[in-house]
Amino acid sequence: MNAAVNKSPQPLTDTFGRVHDSLRISVTDRCNIRCFYCMPEEGVHFMDRAEILTFEEIERFVRAAVPLGISKIRLTGGEPLLRRDLPRLIEKLAAIPGIRDMALTTNAVLLEKQAADLYSAGLRRLNIHLDTLDRN
């Protein structure tokens, strides 16, 4: 029998020897605001929806990453709250054995409407970016 088959997966390590335990997943390239440094009004080309990973593909990828030491997931975008049925994805990912932290980076524009469902699905941490304190 091939010895490589019985070998446990090695943790994800960068060229400096640092072990990585977190995975950032962009669930959409769409955004509902236009920050000049990220989504300028012109020149942004969005991916076809068929090119964006399905929830099943994302779940399969995370399941494959857990044996490599991944235990933390951060969902980003674009604006991840624009992704339809996001709580369903969070629920699937939070239920994967070995995942101990689920986080979301958001501009929070849509958060009020979705917060309860996100929490119920297993989201426990938010990173809210404020790109200005000026309403205009």
Q: What label would you give each PLM region?
A:
Residues 1-2, 134:
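Short intrinsically disordered, low-complexity coil segments enriched in acidic
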Residues 2-102:
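Conserved alpha-helical substructure of the radical SAM core
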Residues 27, 44, 80-82, 100, ...:
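Conserved radical SAM core fold
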Residues 119-121:
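Acidic (Asp/Glu)-rich catalytic clusters
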